[in-house]
């Protein structure tokens, strides 16, 4: 009797509705008794933990991990995105002028739809339309920050207190600045100013003290480490959203056409400031460990339907700027 599953048996849950995102370190991933499991060592014991692949969107493998060919085959059949990255949200490879933040292996067991790829490519070579896409992404980003920073969930965090009018003024200023942008570099300048101001606002909201955002995973304080870690989880969701729609990671609209995987960073930015940033500072002041913070982020992603936001934003931009005649 053939007990093998077909890919269609495993893809019954839409990616945007899948509940699980995994970040694993110091373990082995294998197939045991027909199930994909990760194995951890505690003393002389090997502990086996099930990964429900049909309800998992992305698995990120950090330092000290190995994965068998059989496990990779099952991940592909279930449509699970795999990302190899450094430990605790640091780049996988870094050198003088080259950095690989995450190396992605997308499921290859089925063809992806071409509708959104055709729409995306039809405008992507036009500088003005690519700029319009970048600004549209930033508008979504602003909406997400307003919604979640001023929402009921964050207002219940007694450690995170700030004046809403300060945030509103900051976002209004950024929104106005976007209307004057003529190039993607103009957008990047405005974005950098806005992000720096958000860091300052968040640090003050929890009485964190002096804070400087470290680059390339070089931060040693808790807030920087948690920001890196949470951002990598956002990259995982972003990679899934682009794969679901059949969009190559190289077709960025803001992070540069030559940066590897730039579209993943563009899409992750839609929710990073809204969801990861405040949680990183709250968790740092609570003295949480990485696992507790990771659960904070995943809960926030699920409750806010972050993957839905990413997929919907990509679809909206693709359809509105498309030059394809149908």
Curated annotation (Swiss-Prot):
Catalytic EC class: hydrolase
UniProt EC number: 3.1.-.-
InterPro entries: CRISPR-assoc_Cas1, CRISPR-assoc_Cas1_C, CRISPR-assoc_Cas1_N, CRISPR-assoc_Cas1_YPEST-subtyp
Reported cofactor(s): Mg(2+); Mn(2+)
An annotated GO BP: maintenance of CRISPR repeat elements
The keyword Transmembrane helix belongs to this UniProt entry's keyword annotation: no
One GO MF term: DNA binding
The family this protein is said to belong to: Belongs to the CRISPR-associated endonuclease Cas1 family.
Role played: CRISPR (clustered regularly interspaced short palindromic repeat), is an adaptive immune system that provides protection against mobile genetic elements (viruses, transposable elements and conjugative plasmids). CRISPR clusters contain sequences complementary to antecedent mobile elements and target invading nucleic acids. CRISPR clusters are transcribed and processed into CRISPR RNA (crRNA). Acts as a dsDNA endonuclease. Involved in the integration of spacer DNA into the CRISPR cassette.
Subunit structure comment from the entry: Homodimer. Interacts with Cas3, in the absence of crRNA.
Protein name: CRISPR-associated endonuclease Cas1
Gene name, Swiss-Prot/TrEMBL: cas1
């Amino acid at each position: 009797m053939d007990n093998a599953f077909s890919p269609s048996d495993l893809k019954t849950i839409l990616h945007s509705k899948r509940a699980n995102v995994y970040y694993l370190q110091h373990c082995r991933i294998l197939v045991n008794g027909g199930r994909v499991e990760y194995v951890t060592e505690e003393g002389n014991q090997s502990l086996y933990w099930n990964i429900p692949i049909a309800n998992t969107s992305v698995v990120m493998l950090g330092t000290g991990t190995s994965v068998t060919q059989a496990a990779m085959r099952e991940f592909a059949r279930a449509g699970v995105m795999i990302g190899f990255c450094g430990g605790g949200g640091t780049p996988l490879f870094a050198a003088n002028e080259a950095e690989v933040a995450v190396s992605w292996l997308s499921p290859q067991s089925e063809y992806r739809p071409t509708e959104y790829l055709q729409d995306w490519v039809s405008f992507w070579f036009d500088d003005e339309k690519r700029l319009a896409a970048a600004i549209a992404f930033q508008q979504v980003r602003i909406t997400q920050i307003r919604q979640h920073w001023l929402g009921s969930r964050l207002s219940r965090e007694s450690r995170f207190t700030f004046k809403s009018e300060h945030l509103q003024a900051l976002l209004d200023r950024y929104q106005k600045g976007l209307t004057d942008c003529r190039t993607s570099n103009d957008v990047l300048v405005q974005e950098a100013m806005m992000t720096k101001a958000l860091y300052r606002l968040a640090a003050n909201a929890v009485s964190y003290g002096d804070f400087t955002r470290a680059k390339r995973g070089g931060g040693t304080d808790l807030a920087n480490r948690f920001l890196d870690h949470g951002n990598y989880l956002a990259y995982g969701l972003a990679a899934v959203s682009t794969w679901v729609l059949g969009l190559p990671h190289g077709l960025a609209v803001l992070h540069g056409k030559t940066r590897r995987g730039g579209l993943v960073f563009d899409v992750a930015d839609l929710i990073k400031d809204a969801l990861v940033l405040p949680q990183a500072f709250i968790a740092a002041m609570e003295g949480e460990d990485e696992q507790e913070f990771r659960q904070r982020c995943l809960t926030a992603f699920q409750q806010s339907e972050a993957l839905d936001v990413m997929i919907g934003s990509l679809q909206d931009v693709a359809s509105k700027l498309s030059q394809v005649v149908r």
